[in-house]
From Swiss-Prot:
<dbReference type="InterPro" id="IPR029058">
    <property type="entry name" value="AB_hydrolase_fold"/>
</dbReference>
<feature type="binding site">
    <location>
        <position position="22"/>
    </location>
    <ligand>
        <name>substrate</name>
    </ligand>
</feature>
<keyword id="KW-0963">Cytoplasm</keyword>
<feature type="domain" description="AB hydrolase-1">
    <location>
        <begin position="15"/>
        <end position="242"/>
    </location>
</feature>
<comment type="subunit">
    <text>Monomer.</text>
</comment>
<feature type="binding site">
    <location>
        <position position="235"/>
    </location>
    <ligand>
        <name>substrate</name>
    </ligand>
</feature>
<dbReference type="InterPro" id="IPR010076">
    <property type="entry name" value="BioH"/>
</dbReference>
<feature type="active site">
    <location>
        <position position="235"/>
    </location>
</feature>
<feature type="binding site">
    <location>
        <begin position="82"/>
        <end position="83"/>
    </location>
    <ligand>
        <name>substrate</name>
    </ligand>
</feature>
<keyword id="KW-0719">Serine esterase</keyword>
<feature type="active site" description="Nucleophile">
    <location>
        <position position="82"/>
    </location>
</feature>
<dbReference type="GO" id="GO:0090499">
    <property type="term" value="F:pimelyl-[acyl-carrier protein] methyl ester esterase activity"/>
</dbReference>
<dbReference type="InterPro" id="IPR000073">
    <property type="entry name" value="AB_hydrolase_1"/>
</dbReference>
<keyword id="KW-0093">Biotin biosynthesis</keyword>
<comment type="function">
    <text>The physiological role of BioH is to remove the methyl group introduced by BioC when the pimeloyl moiety is complete. It allows to synthesize pimeloyl-ACP via the fatty acid synthetic pathway through the hydrolysis of the ester bonds of pimeloyl-ACP esters.</text>
</comment>
<feature type="active site">
    <location>
        <position position="207"/>
    </location>
</feature>
<comment type="similarity">
    <text>Belongs to the AB hydrolase superfamily. Carboxylesterase BioH family.</text>
</comment>
Length: 256
């Protein structure tokens, strides 16, 4: 039986689960771990098939969420970045009693562009899937570079993301393809109308993967949720703007 890698950090009286994005692992939170650890008990996890949670194949969103839920705290704020935002959202849908609040970071309920909905063109996601089998390492690096484009610290931020990937075992191509398939096909826009826990959505103004145009659309679709756009951030605001990012979480915590 394979186990998912978890680590608990910090001694705060509020539990916070942090879920990373596609191709990465829990080391991505290293730059904010100290700051958040004095206010929260952090639960860091490598998603199934990523980092130290090896031995898993490609999964659907539902399967991935079920695996993560097995060893998760009874109640916590669930924060998911990018692909991790879909896992956190699915957790809020399937186990609402365990989700004190939901936070999505540079994430979308529907990453793929649809009619009347801004997103990544499906053919671009399909292209990434094709390139993975051709040149695995280069495709992952290209995807990481896209995440920091436009920020004042873009090169440095991209190096940070690359070091996170290289710090742990690389996911299998099958797992990465499965993650891209989730990004290409999942649409939780309607389902998330029904969540009623506090729900904060954080975006980067310069994000090239999750367009800021979705923020007002979701403000209308999900009036119970709150959105915040970080002015000079791209797809990884916790790396480029750690202080503002942590402050947004402290504000949420104080409102619970």
């Amino acid at each position: 039986m394979n186990d998912i890698w978890w680590q608990t950090y910090g001694e705060g009286n509020c539990h916070l689960v942090l879920l990373h994005g596609w191709g990465l692992n829990a080391e991505v939170w290293h730059c904010i771990r100290e700051e958040l650890g004095s206010h929260f008990t952090l639960h860091l996890v490598d998603l199934p098939g990523y980092g130290r949670s090896s031995g898993f194949g490609a999964m659907t969103l539902e399967e991935m969420t079920a695996q993560v839920a097995k060893n998760a705290p009874d109640q916590a704020i669930w924060l998911g970045w990018s692909l991790g935002g879909l896992v956190a959202s699915q957790m809020a849908l399937t186990h609402p009693e365990r989700v004190q609040a939901l936070v999505t970071v540079a994430s979308s309920p529907c990453f793929s562009a649809r009619e009347g909905w801004p997103g990544i063109k499906p053919e671009i996601l399909g292209g990434f899937q094709q390139q993975l089998s051709d040149d695995f390492q280069r495709t992952v690096e290209r995807f990481l570079a896209l995440q920091t484009l436009g920020t004042e610290t873009a090169r440095q931020d991209a190096r940070t993301l690359k070091s996170v990937v290289l710090a742990q075992p690389m996911p299998d191509v099958e797992v990465l393809n499965g993650g891209l398939e989730i990004l290409k096909t999942v649409d939780l826009r309607e389902a998330l109308k029904n969540v009623n826990m506090p729900f904060l959505r954080l975006y980067g103004y310069l994000d090239g993967l999750v367009p800021r145009k979705i923020a007002p659309l979701l403000d209308t679709l999900w009036p119970h949720s709150t959105s915040q756009i970080m002015a000079k951030a791209a797809h990884a605001p916790f790396i480029s703007h750690p202080a503002a990012f942590c402050q947004a979480l402290m504000t949420l915590k104080s409102s619970l």
